[in-house]
């Protein structure tokens, strides 16, 4: 995955990816995981062609399990965090999938944070799932950073700073990511995100 990232960085496509996804492509970019699986796990290509393989983030897996495999979906906030989404068009970035040779069909549908994600019956009765949101974006929302210019910093293993930048998508300089904070009633709110990987984890008791 590292070599592919370096190869992309040497081309004009690198800047296009940043301007489209809001994120710098790297080994953490989800579509590159699947590319590695395709190249290294025997039989996976055939299983994808048969429709026996699906891909997604942790929220996708949870919804899939909770609904008994009936719903394969993710939210805008989670999709934008993968680095595989055209965040302005609000859809998967087809050109990136084509470039690395990964079928977009294995990725989940993208829905609003307050959308219908099916129902679960694991507790006996039928319980509707009507909310899915990524972790840092949920913290931004929970801490009432609803208006453009409001900021939160979450400190734990690392530290994550998020700034609500309103309804207009724009990339940020200096390696700071631009992500979708949430999509409510068909309207996206964007945020910029800076990460310090080591904060609390610097202390080993």
Language-model segments: residues:
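Conserved beta-strand -> loop -> alpha-helix junction used to position metal-binding or nucleic-acid-contacting
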Residues: 1-4
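Active-site core segments that coordinate phosphate-bearing ligands/cofactors
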Residues: 6-72, 83-94, 98-99, 120-205
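Flexible, glycine/charged-enriched surface loops at secondary-structure junctions
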Residues: 52, 105-107
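Nucleotide/phosphate-binding loop and acidic/charged catalytic motifs
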Residues: 73-79
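Gly/charged, well-structured mid-domain segments that form the phosphate/adenylate-handling core
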Residues: 109-116
């Amino acid at each position: 995955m590292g070599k592919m990232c370096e190869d992309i960085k040497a081309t004009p496509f690198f800047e296009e990816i940043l301007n489209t996804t809001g994120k710098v492509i790297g080994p953490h970019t989800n579509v590159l995981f699947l590319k590695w699986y395709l190249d290294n796990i025997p039989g996976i290509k055939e299983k994808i062609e048969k429709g026996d393989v699906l891909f997604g983030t942790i929220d996708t897996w949870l919804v899939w399990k909770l609904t008994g495999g009936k719903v394969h979906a993710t939210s805008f906030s989670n999709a934008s965090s993968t680095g595989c989404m055209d965040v302005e068009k609000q859809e998967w970035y087809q050109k990136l999938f084509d470039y690395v040779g990964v079928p977009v069909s294995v990725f989940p549908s993208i829905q609003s944070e307050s959308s219908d994600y099916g129902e679960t019956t694991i507790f006996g009765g039928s319980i509707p799932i009507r909310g899915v949101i990524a972790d840092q974006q949920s913290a931004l929302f929970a801490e009432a950073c609803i208006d453009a210019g409001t900021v939160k910093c979450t400190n734990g293993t690392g530290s994550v700073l998020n700034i609500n930048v309103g309804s207009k998508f724009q990339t940020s300089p200096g390696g700071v990511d631009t992500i979708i904070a949430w999509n409510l009633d068909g309207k996206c709110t964007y945020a910029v995100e800076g990460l310090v990987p080591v904060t609390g984890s610097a202390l080993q008791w």
